[in-house]
Amino acid sequence: MTRKRTSPIRAVLRFAASVMMVSGVLLIADAALTLAWQEPISAYLAAQDQTALKHQFLKLPASKVRKHRAQLKGDAIAKIELPAIHQTSYVVEGTDTGDLRKGPGHYPDTPLPGEHGTVAIAGHRTTYGAPFRHIDSLSNGDRITIAMPDGTFVYRVYKTKIVDDSALWVKKKLSFDQLILSACHPLHSAA
């Protein structure tokens, strides 16, 4: 029995096809693992962080947040309630990756609730408990309550807008008090 010899071009094409098939399988496996493993695990870890933040928030002296805010980076400073989307979370000071893994984060360069200007808070829509997963479902008139150690502040949604991730103007101080909530869009994207 004689065996036909394959041409070098055919061998290269066969190898390339094999590499592409294996790559495709790996990409699908990565997506499946992300949904089946990473999201539930990160949600579990975020729930543990939120429990710790709750205890931290309940012990926080009323004067500490406003006077020593810089020292509270990564610590609980507030509780945010968004009844329209059935979400309650503890807010940390800061918006770095580590801060946002714990829960929504207050932009340090913006005022705190109760201070004049634009209060800005960021949160994840996917992973780490996804506190702002349904932020796109908020409608005009929906209530947002932020409890601080020294008082409770109620805001109403008056506008929703999708902006580019470089739109830092949304945090600009205006002549009136407002709250800006920010999260990545579309769902499952990250800026």
How would you name each of these model-derived features?
Residues 3, 8-191:
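Solvent-exposed, non-transmembrane regions of membrane-associated and secreted proteins
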